[in-house]
């Protein structure tokens, strides 16, 4: 009978980013602009790479995949968050909450894998430039991206399935703006120790594994750069990696703050702030990070604008 009583929660109430009415409209406008810039920047990057033959290289293939993932996973979160600023009480059904968690988990983990793949790509480009196109064949690139998606799916399915088996007796108030697993675990009336263990192990192994690939790749890149005699050559080699290294640092810095910690140290308010960065701000910044210091992207964008102006 106790188990039956623990099946009453069929929907959750999302508290959103703030409950202060005077801030809601301002935040709605702010995050609507951020979301619009995110979509415009990432979809624009994909289109620019597609229409520019010079950018049809492994590096930009991975960048277009990263842009697609950024656009998708911000879209999993942003619409529901924006609605929460306009209504008094924002609710989400249990099944919709589970699906949001599933898709977000797949996409954010895929992004982590893609960043490590891109580090390996930069390693091959700097250390073996003459064999770059041979080593990073189209088939190999597609396999790497496919592997990243499969890895992200396995990770997210593991947590989603274990989460769906929990019982929720109430309260049903999620102190967050989306269905993130730590904020859901504290609402369950079941034993969540296994869920916490899986979250810690999977997040830790994936983070350490992907960061190890990034670290080794950049260590070998640094050694290769030091062997370059000309200052201009060293500068060119470093500039090809600086944008990616910046993106990796921001992405893993925010995610590790949230997920690689026990529930006893979990704070909803600090987690909300950090979550804004990796769900909305980072997807917006990535196109800027990869384009502002990239001469090829800037030239391609300039040509595209000139062609558009000429056609008009």
From Swiss-Prot:
Domain of life the protein comes from: Eukaryota
Give residue spans on the Cytoplasmic membrane side.
47-54, 121-133, 218-237, 293-312
| Recorded GO CC terms | membrane; plasma membrane
* Main subcellular location: membrane
Q: Which processes are annotated in GO (biological process)?
A: G protein-coupled receptor signaling pathway; sensory perception of smell
Q: Which Pfam families match?
A: 7tm_4 (PF13853)
Recall the GO molecular function terms of this protein's record: G protein-coupled receptor activity; olfactory receptor activity
- Membrane-topology annotation of the record: Multi-pass membrane protein
Q: Which residues are glycosylated?
A: 5
Q: Which cysteines are joined by disulfide bonds?
A: 97-189
Where, subcellularly, is it found?
A: Cell membrane
- Provide the transmembrane region boundaries: 26-46, 55-75, 100-120, 134-154, 197-217, 238-258, 272-292
User: Which keywords appear in this protein's UniProt record, sorted alphabetically?
Assistant: Cell membrane, Disulfide bond, G-protein coupled receptor, Glycoprotein, Membrane, Olfaction, Receptor, Sensory transduction, Transducer, Transmembrane, Transmembrane helix
Question: Which CDD domains does this UniProt record tie to the protein?
Answer: 7tmA_OR5-like (cd15230)
The segments annotated as topological domain Extracellular are 1-25, 76-99, 155-196, 259-271
Report the PANTHER family cross-referenced here.
OLFACTORY RECEPTOR
What family is this? Belongs to the G-protein coupled receptor 1 family.
Function of the molecule: Potential odorant receptor.
Name of the molecule in the record: Olfactory receptor 5J3
Q: Which organism is it from?
A: Mus musculus (Mouse)
Q: List the gene name.
A: Or5j3
């Amino acid at each position: 009978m106790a188990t039956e009583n623990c099946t009453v929660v069929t929907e959750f109430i999302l508290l959103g980013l703030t409950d202060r009415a005077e801030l809601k409209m301002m935040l709605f406008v702010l995050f609507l602009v951020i979301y619009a810039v995110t979509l415009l920047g990432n979809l624009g990057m994909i289109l620019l790479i597609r229409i520019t033959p010079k950018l049809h290289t492994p590096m930009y293939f991975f960048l277009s995949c990263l842009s697609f993932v950024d656009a998708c996973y911000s879209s999993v979160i942003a619409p529901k968050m924006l609605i929460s600023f306009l209504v008094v009480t924002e609710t989400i059904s249990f099944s919709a909450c589970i699906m949001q968690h599933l898709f977000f988990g797949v996409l954010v983990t895929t992004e982590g894998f893609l960043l490590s793949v891109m580090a390996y790509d930069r390693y091959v480009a700097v250390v073996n430039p003459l064999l770059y196109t041979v080593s990073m064949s189209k088939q190999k690139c597609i396999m790497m991206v496919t592997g990243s998606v499969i890895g992200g799916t396995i990770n997210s399915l593991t947590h989603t399935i274990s989460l769906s088996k929990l019982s929720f007796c109430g309260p049903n108030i999620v102190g967050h703006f989306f269905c993130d697993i730590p904020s859901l675990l504290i609402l369950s009336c079941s034993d969540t120790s296994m869920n916490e263990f899986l979250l810690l192990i999977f997040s830790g192994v994936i983070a350490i594994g992907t960061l190890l690939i990034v670290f080794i790749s950049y260590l070998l890149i640094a050694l290769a750069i030091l062997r370059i005699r000309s200052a201009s050559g060293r500068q060119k080699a470093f500039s090809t990696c600086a944008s990616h290294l910046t993106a990796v640092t921001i992405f893993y810095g925010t995610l590790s703050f949230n997920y690689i910690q026990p529930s006893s140290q979990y704070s909803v308010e600090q987690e909300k702030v950090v979550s804004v960065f990796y769900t909305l701000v980072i997807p917006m910044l990535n196109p800027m990070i990869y384009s502002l210091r990239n001469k090829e992207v800037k030239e391609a964008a300039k040509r595209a604008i000139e062609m558009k102006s000429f056609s008009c």
